[in-house]
Amino acid sequence: MIIFNNLPSFFVPLVGLVFPAIAMASLSLHVQKNKIF
């Protein structure tokens, strides 16, 4: 039960770091595919 209680404090920074990383990666792939640069 201790692990279950500590789950939100583990997932909040994980989501806060992983979601922007996925967003930036998909954005950079989208830019490379469209060849804006």
UniProtKB/Swiss-Prot annotation:
Pfam families: PSI_8 (PF00796)
Transmembrane portions of the chain: 7-27
Superkingdom in the source lineage: Eukaryota
Any one annotated GO CC term: photosystem I
InterPro entries: PSI_PsaI, PSI_PsaI_sf
Biological processes annotated in GO: photosynthesis
Locations listed in the record: Plastid, Chloroplast thylakoid membrane
Keyword annotations of the record: Chloroplast, Membrane, Photosynthesis, Photosystem I, Plastid, Thylakoid, Transmembrane, Transmembrane helix
Membrane topology label: Single-pass membrane protein
Principal location class: plastid
HAMAP family, A to Z: PSI_PsaI
Xref: NCBIfam families: PS_I_psaI (TIGR03052)
Function: May help in the organization of the PsaL subunit.
Family, as annotated: Belongs to the PsaI family.
Protein name in UniProt: Photosystem I reaction center subunit VIII
Species this protein is from: Eucalyptus globulus subsp. globulus
